Amino acid sequence: PPGPSKTIADVGCGYGPIGLAIGKASPHHQITMLDINNRALALAEMNKTKNQVDNVTIMESDCLSAVNHQCFDYILTNPPIRAGKDIVHRIFEQAFDRLKTTGELYVVIQKKQGMPSAKKKIEELFGNVEIIAKSKGYYILKSIKG
């Protein structure tokens, strides 16, 4: 997003495609990339170095537990569906707690991998959810904390 510096969390960052792309394109924003998988974190660090992205912090974290003292303007996630619905829903719950007022949650999810139940859970938490894009079975959901 353009404008003043924002804080952005990429939850379940994997090897880093989302967080690093945003960090590279928007060097004035502060990106925190979180994952519980050590291999994913090592690859994210390697990609951060290779792409010379300086405004990104990469941390080991179970959902958002490592940043429970911090609030964000934006939280992005392509949740680890294979980890199970409980973990995915915990990401949404912790995202609600860690977002600033008027903060935004963005979720990338496949319809066949739980989009309807994810959408329902997000709507229960946030009171709103919008499908802002869909293509080839993938959906991007957006919610605003109000």
Report each predicted region and the residues it spans.
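Conserved SAM/SAH cofactor-binding pocket of Class I
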Residues: 1-77
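Class I S-adenosylmethionine-dependent transferase superfamily signal
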Residues: 22, 95, 122
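Short beta->alpha hinge that forms the Motif I/post-I loop of the SAM-binding pocket
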Residues: 35-38, 87, 110
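Glycine-rich phosphate-binding "P-loop"
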Residues: 77-86
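A short glycine-rich, Lys/Arg-flanked "PGG" loop and its adjoining helix->strand segment in the class I
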Residues: 90-101
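Conserved beta-strand signature within the Rossmann-like core of class I S-adenosyl-L-methionine
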Residues: 102-109
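Conserved class I S-adenosyl-L-methionine
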Residues: 110-125
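Core SAM-dependent methyltransferase catalytic element
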Residues: 134-146
